[in-house]
């Protein structure tokens, strides 16, 4: 059997999904290792593979935040910018549009340009907008620029000459000379030959800025995977949702900046609903995207590194990237987002995140600031009986907010929950209401480790009556990678090209060569489109291509009216020609577990990298019984009274009938997995093993053969050295935490505070609707069903939340 592996590296967690043609699936979740991202990948892949032969892996598809983080943290390589004489200041001068956050800031200063003014160089040449050579390239000026660049110790250069999209000959000649002394040189005609000088320049600069990092990273990734026996091709997802080879991704690194969020949108598009709003909330950020007719919305320009980033919707706030990307709105709101009080004493949440180290206070890894995860634990939405969390630490953190606000702990916690839900709703607002889309006709597809806990509250703000939580929602982005097809985009600007067919043919041949296919191969699909504008206007709109000028004009008029709300007619002109070439891959694995699955054989083998020196001797918190969760959130007796015992009390406020998480063990040995009670994987803002021992790179695994899920945490020291493993084996479905429903106290304002609510898994709720308030503990997340909502389990094992008509109209 051949296997495909999807790997999604996020700001807090690294998710791995292994799919096979028979429908078997294994999932792993581990803390992202920011000091060495590949360490977390290897740990997760090792756990997901288990006893399977790594040589049977046929494909690894990867989505990474490496490029995004390099831009946001300004950790790329130093870049030299080479341009036409007289235009050196175009990029340093830049553009910036003030946003709400800094509109009245008297000390405001725009972000620094992507390249320093002293690192910009000019060469003598000139080409017209139609491609005619007005001044030949002076090669001596190129050599002088190369010498100056080398003298400064710069090893990466971006070449963007005026109107090179119309005639790239000078760029190619200049690059040839520069490569004699500079290792990494990219040209705008190679990266994205589209009209608009500033955007084309910044796109080229960003590719040179992150390209060497991406090339080194992907090379090391292939080497490290080969060390564990995986020699399959490594593919990387582009921002537009296509998948390309690692070699091509290294050359076109700028096209991978939004690869991680794109994978999640593909997963949302595959839920079976034609019109959905993708809602992905992880540990650091939340993303929203509109999918209409099963196809995600695409933008041809987005901004990265800006303040208050909303993807392509906050033009001017960051560095413009002129490549296709799934049109996302993103906010700094995740499970690890820190709650704080501003100078006026108002409660704020985010955008700063506790990340994976130290993480939320309840992790017990040294964090003390209150986060969204801590608030959800205090509210009873998370269980420390099945997850290795410390309620006392969460309570202490929330007290830091409650005391100055003059409210009770649970009121402060719910305020955090509401504020972060409102923040995430702003992302949904950007991609729907702000563009004239009524969200009430859409289903909200929630995934990511923290998304299902907040999805219903976000939906309520827009009158959305259906929320869909797909199977394996906590690793949906990694699962979406398995469905990605080989695909790439190309563009060329030609003002009213005399032979559009020849332009499309050239672009198609170029894209096919990059993917290693022929345009005539079976299953290869080429989608053509063109940018059209009214003559005399500078902004254009993209419409699908047709050779008929009249039909093309009609499509443009209709699109213009849809976007701007104005019916206008006039003479049009064609600006840029676009193609997307998609090549077939092996059929995607069926990652949906059947409703009734057999119990897998217990895996009692420690992971290959386990060592005895860093053994986790902590018994699992839920090892005593799989059927009772007597968790009581802190101060759960009333919505206003604080009855939480002090941190050093004998019994913690989230007491269970099991041994305490820090109970001593007779010997540092790994427990027998077959004797441990099953428990769900953590949501995307909580660690897997017990907090005192959980470090970066420790993985948590779930397997299904087919459909059954086994979750297995391991431990690792913060330096990445792995320790002995503990494991929990679930009996069926998505990691059922118990054979029968349980109950615990959770806070809902509709119930006037804390109330006993049922706690189910996808298996225990099968066959009957589950009215709220209720909690569904999933394999990698937790689904909160508020009052007025009803949960049902679909045949695809997706959980559907529907809101009562009375609630929607009230």
Report each predicted region and the residues it spans.
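N-terminal glycine/serine-rich phosphate-binding loop of ATP-dependent small-molecule kinases
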Residues: 1-79, 128, 135-158, 171-192, ...
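Conserved phosphate-binding loops in N-terminal lobes of ATP-dependent enzymes
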Residues: 6, 15-17, 26-27, 31, ...
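C-terminal, non-catalytic interaction/recognition modules in large multi-subunit enzymes and RNPs
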Residues: 9, 140-148, 271, 283, ...
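Glycine-rich phosphate-binding loop of actin/hexokinase-like ATP-binding domains
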Residues: 19, 27-33, 80-86, 246, ...
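Short, ordered loop/turn segments at secondary-structure junctions
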Residues: 21, 84-87, 162-164, 190-192, ...
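Conserved short loop/turn motifs at secondary-structure junctions
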Residues: 58-59, 158-167, 207-210, 413-418, ...
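Terminal amphipathic helices with adjacent charged low-complexity linkers/tails
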Residues: 160-204, 208, 571, 576-590, ...
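Long, intrinsically disordered low-complexity tandem-repeat segments
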Residues: 591-664, 703-704, 708-709, 716-717, ...
